[in-house]
């Protein structure tokens, strides 16, 4: 399964090598020409008839991660978060992969053994460590290096019509775009799998500048709010609703006429979709729209429960609707 293989790849910001290699192998298998730029973006060019607009489809490869910054005398690893979406609550007692393939467990001292009384400080990353079962600092440094990345290790599981996996926020988009290239119509368009989304969308900045698209369509995940305790302030997002289109997100307000036009086109084509008022994360389309002379932007999102957490849950039918929407855009532009 394509999504399973992508979720099992490690892809810290700036360390997307595994994801990039897998995507490059898939592009070669389907015969799609591509290049890798100086920042590590994979840029694919689908051949075909030129359309009315130059379209760029975008998905990011990286995921929230950790970086090893110190080793204690007893061999425990100290770390810091890479990106803004890593929380100590997500990491507690999680299995992680450090460096090439060193397994470890995130731990912290039991509360009753801490001198700290403040609850927030107790839960901070400063009081967490990674245990790789090394007996000393010297033994630990034989297996890892300062500066190595670590990512949470969580198995991919099919749960009936749903799937659970790690790094869903990025790998859902990569999967959808690869499926588009597999089944694409006879139209010319470009695709970019970007690096370093989690640390400021650095890969998208370069790709949008060099490709100069008329329309940028990014594809990622949106947190589903169909869970206990969700306030649903921006409207309910549920698994099984199909592909979502954002009017606004944390970084951009999308042209209403563009969103409404594609929402109408989806309805006419029988594609299950809905417009959401607000998405909590800044999508790449909005960022790319500001490069050079600007571009039209559309943010497509697949509902997923806890997409940026170590384990997200999505519905297969939503991914299928997203792929159908990408194909529709490629055909009509």
What are these regions (language model features)?
Residues 1-333:
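N-terminal hydrophobic/helix-forming segments and targeting peptides
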């Amino acid at each position: 399964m394509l999504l399973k293989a992508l979720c099992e790849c490690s892809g810290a910001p700036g360390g997307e090598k595994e994801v990039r290699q897998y995507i490059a192998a898939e592009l070669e298998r389907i015969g799609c020409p591509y290049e890798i730029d100086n920042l590590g973006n994979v840029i694919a060019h689908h051949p075909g008839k030129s359309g009315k607009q130059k379209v760029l489809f975008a998905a990011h490869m990286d995921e929230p991660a950790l970086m090893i910054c110190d080793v204690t005398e007893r061999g425990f690893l100290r770390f810091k978060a890479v990106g803004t979406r890593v929380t100590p609550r997500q990491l507690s007692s999680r299995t992680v992969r450090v460096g090439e393939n060193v397994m470890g467990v995130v731990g912290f001292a039991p509360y009753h053994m801490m001198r700290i009384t403040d609850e927030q400080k107790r839960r901070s990353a400063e009081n967490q460590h990674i245990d790789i079962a090394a007996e000393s600092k010297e033994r630990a440094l034989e297996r890892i290096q300062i500066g190595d990345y670590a990512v949470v290790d969580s198995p991919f599981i099919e749960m009936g019509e749903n799937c659970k996996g790690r790094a869903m926020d990025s790998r859902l988009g990569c999967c959808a775009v690869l499926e588009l290239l597999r089944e694409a119509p006879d139209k010319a368009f470009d695709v970019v799998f970007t690096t370093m989304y989690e640390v400021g969308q650095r890969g998208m900045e370069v790709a949008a500048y060099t490709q100069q698209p008329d329309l940028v369509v990014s594809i990622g995940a949106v947190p589903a709010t169909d869970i206990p305790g969700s306030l649903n302030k921006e409207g309910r997002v549920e698994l099984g609703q199909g592909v979502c289109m954002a009017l606004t997100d944390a970084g951009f307000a999308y042209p209403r006429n563009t969103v409404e036009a594609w929402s109408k086109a989806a309805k006419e084509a029988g594609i299950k979709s809905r417009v959401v008022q607000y998405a909590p994360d800044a999508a790449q389309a909005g960022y790319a729209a500001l490069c050079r002379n600007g571009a039209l932007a559309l943010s497509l999102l697949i509902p997923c429960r806890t997409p940026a957490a170590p384990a997200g849950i999505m519905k297969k039918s939503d991914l299928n609707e997203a792929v159908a929407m990408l194909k529709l855009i490629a055909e009509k532009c």
